[in-house]
Swiss-Prot record:
Name of protein: NADH-quinone oxidoreductase subunit E
Enzyme class (EC, first level): translocase
Function: NDH-1 shuttles electrons from NADH, via FMN and iron-sulfur (Fe-S) centers, to quinones in the respiratory chain. Couples the redox reaction to proton translocation (for every two electrons transferred, four hydrogen ions are translocated across the cytoplasmic membrane), and thus conserves the redox energy in a proton gradient.
Gene name linked to the record: nuoE
Entry similarity comment: Belongs to the complex I 24 kDa subunit family.
Species classification: Bacteria, Pseudomonadati, Pseudomonadota, Alphaproteobacteria, Rickettsiales
Record-listed E.C. numbers: 7.1.1.-
Residues the record lists as binding [2Fe-2S] cluster: 91, 96, 132, 136
InterPro entries: NuoE-like (IPR002023), NuoE_dom (IPR042128), NuoE_N (IPR041921), Thioredoxin-like_sf (IPR036249)
CDD domains: TRX_Fd_NuoE
Cofactor: how bound: Binds 1 [2Fe-2S] cluster.
Keywords: 2Fe-2S, Iron, Iron-sulfur, Metal-binding, NAD, Quinone, Translocase
Gene3D superfamilies: Glutaredoxin (3.40.30.10), NADH-quinone oxidoreductase subunit E (1.10.10.1590)
Highest taxon above the source species: Bacteria
Cofactor requirement: [2Fe-2S] cluster
Length: 167
């Protein structure tokens, strides 16, 4: 299966949305729309940003590709490789680690049959580590796509995975 993306353009709906986003910024500051436009491109492309999508957004904002690439590689919310339908991101910073994020990672690996930074064969799950999600009071925390799961135990995490596997 060839997974290389050689071209990207926003579909009509997202192009209209991108234009509306850009209008929120002054003409001399439209480059500031880089984060929402990269996010829009990633959502349109199934959860990851191929190089042509980054190039497209850079051109749309009249900025050098390297500047857009720097943004895409700096923020952990952007994925430069394909991810599964469910992107499970386990917070492993100190508060989550103290409250058992290692155990959460272990149950994820066991239930999914993959290691950190891997995607299941059926492309349904990708397991990642992430830095602080800002929900330390409810550690350990996992983000799956756009949703946070807090105060997790191995049992709770196992049930979440079971539910998603049956989806």
């Amino acid at each position: 299966m060839n997974t290389k993306i050689t071209n990207f353009t926003f579909d009509k709906k997202n192009l209209n949305l991108a234009e509306e986003i850009i209008k929120k910024y002054p003409p001399h500051g439209k480059r500031s729309a880089i984060l929402p436009l990269l996010d829009l491109a990633q959502r349109q492309n199934g959860g990851w940003l191929p190089v042509p999508a980054i190039e497209y957004v850079a051109n749309m904002l009249a900025m050098p590709y390297i500047r857009a690439y720097e943004v895409a590689t700096f923020y952990t919310m952007f994925n430069l490789k394909r991810v599964g339908k469910y992107h499970i991101q386990v917070c492993t910073t100190t508060p989550c680690w103290l409250r058992g994020s290692d155990d959460i990672m272990k149950i994820c690996e066991k239930k999914l049959g993959v290691k950190l930074k891997e995607t299941t064969e059926d492309q349904k799950f990708t397991l990642s580590e992430i830095e602080c999600l800002g929900a330390c009071v409810n550690a350990p925390v996992v983000q799956i796509n756009d949703d946070y799961y807090e105060d997790l135990t191995q049992d709770k995490m196992g049930k979440i995975i079971d539910k998603l596997q049956n989806d």
